């Protein structure tokens, strides 16, 4: 089997045929974890044996055991390797997202297990995207997302959560990568912290004529502001992305709580930034989990 991540289209039939056993899934995960060969984290020796019944590697020098999933978001999970692989494939290959109820039915696990799997996958998406910063031309703005609230005197209701959004784009206005962050407020210092974490210094930031944005980003970015008008073609990529994000949250997940909103934003950003990969997204997600 090729040592590369999957490059061509992989159908459900292809996936079933390629990963029809624990051994094949184990081989796939090991290639992801050790693309240049195993190296013991304890003694540095490159030879090991396998304890397949427990998905462990045993160093032939120091005899220490290393779990295939150690250091990953699935560490200490009781899932089989096939379940992990199926979960990644099903989650990655539905561009609308996948709810815990859907995954529960497809994997034939209980709801709590399905929910745990999706939380782990979203965490892997977040960790992978934290490696990268937006640069070049970046559209920046904020939005409000309705989130469910519980425990109020009148029962369940909704409140608006503040979200800062930034979308990088090319010179011909094609959007590339995106960042979204739930924010406690929309003050200048908050925009400044968001930019420091997510936007490379020296980038050209395009936004509306918001005083907090001007003050928060004035020192380290080339700024371009316009007073917002619905007739103008300004921040179109960003507003389209916001609309798509809200459609995913309402359509697939039927709303989320404020406590978990960031997890769903992380999922959306990972998908959006890799939307051109199509079914190759499975390989990208697997790499995010195991690399």
Segments from the language model and where they lie:
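Residue-level recognition of single "structural anchor" positions
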Residues: 1-291
């Amino acid at each position: 089997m090729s040592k590369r991540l999957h490059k061509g289209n992989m159908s459900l039939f292809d996936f079933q045929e390629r990963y029809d056993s624990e051994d094949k899934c184990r081989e796939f995960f090991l290639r992801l974890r050790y693309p240049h060969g195993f190296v013991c984290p304890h003694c540095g020796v490159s030879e090991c044996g396998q304890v397949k019944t427990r998905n462990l590697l045993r160093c032939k020098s120091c005899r220490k055991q290393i779990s295939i999933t150690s250091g990953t978001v699935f560490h200490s999970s009781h899932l089989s390797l096939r379940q992990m692989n199926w979960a990644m494939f099903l989650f990655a290959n539905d561009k609308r997202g996948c709810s815990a109820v859907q995954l529960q039915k497809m994997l034939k696990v209980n709801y709590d297990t399905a929910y745990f799997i999706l939380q782990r996958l979203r965490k892997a998406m977040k960790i992978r995207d934290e490696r990268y910063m937006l640069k070049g031309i970046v559209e920046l703005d904020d939005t409000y997302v309705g989130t469910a609230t519980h425990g109020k005197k009148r029962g369940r209701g909704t409140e608006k959560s503040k979200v800062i959004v930034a979308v990088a784009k090319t010179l011909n206005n094609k959007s590339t990568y995106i960042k979204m962050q739930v924010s406690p407020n929309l003050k200048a210092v908050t925009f400044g912290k968001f930019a420091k974490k997510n936007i490379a210094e020296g980038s050209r930031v395009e936004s509306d004529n918001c005083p907090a944005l001007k003050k928060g980003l004035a020192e380290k970015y080339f700024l371009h502001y316009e007073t917002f008008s619905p007739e103008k073609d300004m921040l179109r990529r960003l507003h389209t992305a916001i609309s798509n994000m809200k459609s995913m949250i309402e359509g697939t997940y039927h709303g989320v709580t404020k406590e978990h909103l960031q997890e769903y934003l992380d999922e959306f950003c990972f998908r959006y930034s890799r939307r051109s990969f199509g079914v190759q997204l499975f390989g990208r997600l697997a790499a995010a989990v195991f690399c």
